[in-house]
Amino acid sequence: MITIGTALRPAATRVMLLGAGELGKEVAIECQRLGIEVIAVGHYADAPAMHIAHRHHVINMLDGAALRAVIEHERPHFIVPEIEAIATDMLVTLEQEGHHVVPCANATRLTMNREGIRRLAAETLSLPTSRYRFAADRAELDKAVEAIGYPFIIKPVMSSSGKGQSLVRDAAQLDAAWQYAQLGGRAGGGKVIVEGLVAFDFEITLLTINAVDGIHFCAPIGHRQEDGDYRESWQPQHMSALARQRAQTIAADVVTALGGKGLFGVELFICGDDVIFSEVSPRPHDTGMVTLISQDLSEFALHVRAFLGLPIGTIRQYGPAASAVILPELQSDNVSFSGLENALAAGQQIRLFGKPDLSGKRRLGVALAVAATVEEAVTVAKDAAAAVRVTG
């Protein structure tokens, strides 16, 4: 029997979010719906999840000592990473001491580093992946390029949202790509992965939930990326029955190997009936924000249910739906939004994240839409996002 204590009382069930961005905010909201006490930890003040958490802390989460200190101070029942830039070795140690890391510390450690998850997928599980090599210095990079050939993608093994990532078409671009990769890593310069290009029809995110009542899948989510970050996502992505079956098999193998209960965002390339593994996040995925309007249980609700040990049951997908990001470009620490009345027709919703500032481009919200077809939903969501005016 699962027992949930009431927030701010001695028997409270406490959830600590490591990362307080827009995804963490939605996880916090789902915890609040169940009366759970929420502590948000982030690397900058006034982050979105901090607005609604019972308490919050600002620390460098790559500092293992600082991470241990805040966890020992708050004594959470569940430690829920929302970002990759965390001292994962400390999470492993804390888990060994009896703390509950979601889904588990090993999954967080492996997926923070592209080398760990790629070797697990390709070498341990023998899943189909792109051709790849790792390089720790410039000399190793030359050897990796010789083995993979042009064109290729270079990425820091520790980065996210496209940071440090480049498409390299010829040798003239190699030096700049290497330098960019060294600047883009979450923990500073370091090892990179060199990946051969994959011929694919489209990419999907397959939200996969490992729960007390088994493994569950959301309908596949298609998405468009630009500069390494998502711009629109939609659900369901049409694909053949065989490809969908293969995608679910790969996703189940990956999340089972990683271990722990929770929701995982499994990224896959689809080419006809063939499926190639790309990456996985052991947490809600940004492309999955479409589930805020497309399903009866969003990816955030599913994650919370799973890590609490509650059953998932049946996930109901309502039909064609899409999300489109609100991505302004300006300098401001006093942002305002207008034009919302033009973005809220029937079948449309807006989420504004409440980020405190921006310097250049930053994702500040998302438009959500349902429609008769996926294509129409994408158009409606993009138009709604464009209707929101951001000033500051």
Swiss-Prot record:
Alphabetical list of PROSITE patterns matching this protein: ATP_GRASP (PS50975)
Keyword Transcription in annotation: no
Alphabetized GO MF terms: ATP binding; magnesium ion binding; phosphoribosylglycinamide formyltransferase 2 activity; phosphoribosylglycinamide formyltransferase activity
Pathway: Purine metabolism; IMP biosynthesis via de novo pathway; N(2)-formyl-N(1)-(5-phospho-D-ribosyl)glycinamide from N(1)-(5-phospho-D-ribosyl)glycinamide (formate route): step 1/1
The protein's Enzyme Commission number: 6.3.1.21
GO cellular component: cytosol
Name of this chain's protein: Formate-dependent phosphoribosylglycinamide formyltransferase
Organism: Sodalis glossinidius (strain morsitans)
